Amino acid sequence: MFAATPATSPVRGIFLMISAVTVFTVMSAFIKAVPNVPAGEAMFFRSIMAMPIILIWLIWQGEWPGGIRTNSVRNHAVRGLVGSAAMGLGFAGLKYLPLPEVTAIRFATPVVMVILAALMLGERLRLIRISAVATGLVGVLIIIWPRLSFGLDNTEALGAIMVLGSACLAALAQVFVKGMSGSETTAAIVFWFSLTSTLASLLTVPFGWVWPNPGEAAFLVGAGLVGGMGQILLTSSYRLADAGVLAPFTYVSMLWSVVIGYIWFDEVPTLPMLFGAALVILAGVVIVLRERQLGSNATARRKVSAKGLQ
């Protein structure tokens, strides 16, 4: 999601990435723990409670207010609305599916992103990418098929469709970020998304919000706080290590979701779900490693061309 700077400390970057996916999994568990709270309301708490943490971080980094200046409010608004829809669908799906299954379906995001980047940014689809995409899509189908086999009117099928829709919209949001990365700072992307998602969540008020009890309020506030921390940890990890180095460690969230789902929600992952998740994870890792290889080759070609001009 964020453009990487030259790697300075891969070990620290990996540690921060593992920390980020851990707190994001905890955030999802907090949202799942309040099934009576509408998804839009949960999104509001997730977004607004993260804002103070993000603002403190921006000030500490010396990126406030200069770092949030933007050349295109419209692009941030579009990206923010798409990302907000992805968040809302994901939160809604958590009510109907086990936490490990939601996590596994979300891993489809980089797979879908390859397809969207080819359609929207004109990126070439080579054989390795096509094979990885096909593998990932088969994995997703294996995960959601048991839910869909009961019919689309089943709540679990609805949950699977919601989470898959969330993954697709998250991929679309990342394509927008990729297109903006040349002109917008990471600080601007983080800040404007948090602001947009906070405002977008208010549009769901007419559809019915509830007054949370103290326990629910604690989980909602906690989701926002750890979500803000996760965003900072994620951003910081990409500043310290290359995306290709960090990518495999994002899948640690699968381990945490299985552990938390079993201990907290009495959820036991099925063999088809684990097999499908393995295929999706394999596809994601192959895609990222291939991207890294292509990036290295492009850098090498630029160096050769530069030497030829000397």
Which sequence ranges carry the predicted segments?
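Juxtamembrane helix-loop-helix junctions in multi-pass membrane proteins
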Residues: 23-50, 172-196
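Structural signature of hydrophobic alpha-helical transmembrane segments
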Residues: 39-52, 92-110, 155-169, 213-227, ...
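Hydrophobic alpha-helical transmembrane segments of multi-pass membrane transport proteins
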Residues: 22-26, 30, 77-92, 164-173, ...
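Membrane-interface interhelical linkers
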Residues: 1-19, 51-78, 151-154, 184, ...
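Cytoplasmic-side transmembrane-helix entry/capping segments in multi-pass membrane proteins
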Residues: 10-17, 70-81, 125-138, 156-160, ...
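C-terminal transmembrane-helix exit sites in multi-pass transporters
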Residues: 90, 109-134, 255-274
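Helix-helix packing/entry segments at the starts of transmembrane helices
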Residues: 102-108, 180-196, 231-263
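Juxtamembrane helix-loop boundary signature in multi-pass membrane transporters
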Residues: 1-16, 114-164, 168, 281-310
